[in-house]
A protein has these predicted regions:
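Short acidic, low-complexity intrinsically disordered linear motifs used
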Residues: 14-33
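Contiguous mid-protein beta-loop-alpha structural module that forms a pocket-lining wall or clamp
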Residues: 149-208
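Active-site-flanking structural segment that lines cofactor/substrate pockets
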Residues: 80-92, 96
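Conserved aromatic-histidine-acidic binding/catalytic patches
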Residues: 13, 68-75, 95, 99, ...
Length: 208
């Protein structure tokens, strides 16, 4: 019989009401206040990011490593896309609430897109799970928010706009998690963003 990692298939350890989960969150916020996420100082023993990438390259196809590096040096965002491992090292030295999830592991904005669901409906969702591992939920949220900020700056938006994009990303995560907290497990499992919903959002922000 094949052994299975518990991951997201494991039943929840506790069955709490949405209000109880909210209180649990407030309690954890006292231990890890939101302001604790606003600052980051590199640890004195922080390794060179290139060394991390070189260590990672040992497990890759040798002929493809130079191609990967060539793509990463094209721009700051291209480097960010390829540098999930160095960022994971940095995130491992940041505050967390201890809430672990089956993380995407590389939740930058270009790892979201459209694809056909099993029922052939077009949906918008995470489309890359090759780095997935159990990890603190904050890591995915921070990498996603950072990706919007880096992309905004690369496109020559102002620092204010870049911060706004990151803030709205985190706000959207928070509001959706609040909505999911009021839903039953199967309702959450089958929840999805249909392409018509995405199209309407884009249409709403287009200049008239």
């Amino acid at each position: 019989m094949t052994r299975m990692s518990p991951g997201v298939l494991a039943p929840p350890r506790e069955l709490l009401t949405p209000e109880q989960w909210k209180q649990r969150g407030r309690d954890q916020r006292r231990e890890v206040p939101r302001l604790s996420h606003a600052q980051w100082e590199p640890p004195l023993d922080r390794p060179d990011p290139v060394d991390i990438l070189e260590e990672q390259a040992r497990t890759r196809v040798p002929d493809l490593v130079p191609i990967r590096y060539g793509r990463m040096i094209a721009s700051p965002f291209a480097y960010f896309r390829g540098a999930a491992a160095p960022m994971a090292w940095d995130l491992a030295h940041t505050p967390t609430t201890g809430i672990r999830v089956q993380a995407c592991g590389d939740a930058h904005l270009l790892n979201f897109g459209m694809f056909a669901a099993p029922d052939r409906h077009l949906v918008f969702d995470v489309n890359d799970f090759d780095e997935t591992l159990p990890a603190p939920f904050e890591w995915d949220v921070k990498r996603l928010a950072a990706s919007f900020a880096v992309a905004a700056r690369e496109q020559e938006f102002s620092d204010h706009d870049a911060r706004t994009a990151a803030r709205l990303t985190v706000r959207s995560y928070r509001t959706e998690m609040f909505r999911y907290a009021t839903m039953r497990f199967l309702k959450v499992w089958y929840s999805r963003i249909d392409i018509d919903e995405v199209t309407s959002l884009f249409d709403a922000v287009q200049p008239k």
